[in-house]
């Protein structure tokens, strides 16, 4: 079989999953028979290869069954593509460059320093509705059983009796670059709604590539994800930006609608863009859908008000 072609297909599917492109799911279903054929050949190479394949492939099927986007993306782009690369080297002496993983040597995270820097950032913001965010973070218990974070800052949330990743566990910064590609294609975005903060890598990338006058609304449906990020990821460079506004469910989410009305203009209505972080559309679909409907309604009201001539 053409394993190089299979590699290219799976690599592209992995990228699409990181980009939140739902066409990847159909493409993955279509390539599964070809992948099955490859597996039947790969397990015969060596006992080590057999153990790896029999560990990874069931993980992929379980991820697909649960529509677990980031686990599927990590499994396809890193684990299965790596298996194919090793197979090619062993069987055909052809070299395929392995996908770069994050440098795990930099796992010494000073959570106290990061946390205080983030809290300092919140205090310096002129918006009063950030005060609740600081209070919540200072009272948050990092041993909470519904959220997990490892020594590298990878975050997973417990929902529907299973753990869901909110960022790539192999190279979240690299995955964030994939996620930003669609944003880069837009001629201009005056207002960007980002639903879900993940581990802030994607947010940091998006905040860098949009014009400085673009209003960025960030909505996080789970306050525990925000709290954990406050200890493990320095997000002060993002939140301190003049046109970046942060809203967290249960803390200051009601301000999202008000700020939408206050800051929206006709140009923002015409050039607004919604980005939903991978996985969030699956595990927080109801919360995000509700906020999108509310924001759309407020945008229409803002446009109507802006175009109304007082008699």
Predicted ranges, named:
Residues 19-20, 26, 33, 40, ...:
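N-terminal donor/sugar-recognition subdomains of glycan-related enzymes
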């Amino acid at each position: 079989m053409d394993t190089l072609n299979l590699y290219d297909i799976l690599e592209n599917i992995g990228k699409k999953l990181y980009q939140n492109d739902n066409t990847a799911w159909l493409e993955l279903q279509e390539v599964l028979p070809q992948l099955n054929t490859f597996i039947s050949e790969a397990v015969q190479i060596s006992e080590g290869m057999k153990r790896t394949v029999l560990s990874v492939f069931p993980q992929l099927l379980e991820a697909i069954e649960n529509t677990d986007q980031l686990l599927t993306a990590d499994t396809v782009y890193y684990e299965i593509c790596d298996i194919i690369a090793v197979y090619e080297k062993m069987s055909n002496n052809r070299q395929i460059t392995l996908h770069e993983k994050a440098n795990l040597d930099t796992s010494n995270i000073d959570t106290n320093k990061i946390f205080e820097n983030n809290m300092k950032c919140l205090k310096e913001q002129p918006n009063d509705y950030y005060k609740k965010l600081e209070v919540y973070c200072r009272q948050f218990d990092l041993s909470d059983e519904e959220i997990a974070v490892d020594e590298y800052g990878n975050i997973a949330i417990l929902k529907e009796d299973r753990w869901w990743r909110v960022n790539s566990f192999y190279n979240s910064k690299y995955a964030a670059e994939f996620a930003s590609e669609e944003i880069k294609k837009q001629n201009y975005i005056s207002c960007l709604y980002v639903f879900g903060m993940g581990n802030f890598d994607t947010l940091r990338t998006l905040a860098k590539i949009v014009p400085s006058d673009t209003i960025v609304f960030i909505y996080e449906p789970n306050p525990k994800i925000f709290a954990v990020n406050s200890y493990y990821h320095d997000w002060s460079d993002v939140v301190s930006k003049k046109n970046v506004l942060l809203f967290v469910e249960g803390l200051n989410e009601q301000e999202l609608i008000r700020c939408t009305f206050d800051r929206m203009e006709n140009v923002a209505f015409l050039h607004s863009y919604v980005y939903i972080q991978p996985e969030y559309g699956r595990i927080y679909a109801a919360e995000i859908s509700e906020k999108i409907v509310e924001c759309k309604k407020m945008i229409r009201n803002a446009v109507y008000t802006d175009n109304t001539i007082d008699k």
